[in-house]
Amino acid sequence: MTRLQDDFYEYVNGKWAETAVIPDDKPSTGGFMDLDRDIENLMLDITGKWQRGEELPEDSILQNFVKYHKMVADFDAREAAGVAPVMPLINEIKALSSFEEYTNKLGTYELAGKPNLMPFSVSPDFMNAQMNVLWGESLALILPDTTYYEEGNEKGPELLAIWRQMMEKLLPKFEFSEAEIKDILDKVIAADAELAKYVLSNEERSEYNKLYHPYEWEEFKTLVPELPLETFFTEVIGQTPDKIIVPEERFWKEFAPTYYSAANWETIHAKLKLGAALDWTSFLTEEIRVLSGEYGRTITGIPEPRPKEKAALALAEGPYSQALGLWYAGEKFSPEAKADVEHKVATMIEVYKDRLEKADWLAPETREKAIVKLNVITPHIGYPEKLPETYAKKIIDESKTLVENAQALYEISIAHTWSKWNQPVDRSE
């Protein structure tokens, strides 16, 4: 038997590891995954009853979730619809004729959740966590990290080949010709290889103290002179921003000026067409759902796709996650239990503060800053006291299609996210 002092992990977990099995549709197993599985099975049982009209919730928000889940889980209807629900978007993107036409529609596309290649976001300021500010990120790579693009990395070309093969099987489903597919993939892969030279590696992204690069708006907009950013942000947030935080400086200084240009329109158009085809794969036929996940399963080492019933529940839960969490907490985590945990956490914080005040091995300034941080912690225990106001807007129209309702939910979420710009962080969410 393994001795404690020789291998602590093996001593504690050895017997469990001998019999533990990773589910075919999961990347790992363990105590937390077991809990996740148990909750998933419970929700499958409960939501199954709701779909059958049994024990229906009285809450109007959850009633809309039930309607949405029914649509997502109506696999016969999804098979019958095929790709028809997304062809208008694909044809709209295909019809774009120029860089100018594309840039004129950027604001509209952003608010509608359509492909637009604008890597901007709103989140708290590193230096003032009380306020939400504008961030300029970068486009995403195909491969998991920049290191996969380095010369001598054998895994990179292998994964890229798997990605391309998946796309070559997937795109014909959306009425792209063989010539169109080759043109799109050639252009996207070439641009991706160039992009990899300028975006941060995963290791660089982990060094948060080096990611904070604030720019005055007048300076930032000169980095991409062919993008009408003032028009874009006026449409999206109602005005021109005053500043932007740029963690991806190489991307914006060395890649973006030539990428976002009329001269690069054909590459941009290829990327947009690919995005239009991929955006809705989770809502279409089972064949398309499974096929579109091949590359992701390869990266994560998951041998089998998630069963369609579980995938449908996860998809439907997305827009209603906090409402479902609140319902679950009401069933499993009483207000008394919540108050008890909140009291314990508050006690723990006071203990930390007391120990910091007596920690004479720390500099006084360090102790003071640590206590300041403890004083502003807002613990989130179990469930929120209120739901975001947007939840009341998430009303499902049963006369519309699944994709039309999902589109409406996306637009509500997008508008809510942008409304946070230049506003205090709501710690109750």
Cite the ranges covered by each PLM segment.
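Extracellular/periplasmic catalytic domains that process cell-envelope and extracellular macromolecules
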Residues: 1-4, 126-128
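Noncatalytic, helix-rich "gating/capping" subdomain that lines the substrate-entry/channel surface
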Residues: 48-343, 347
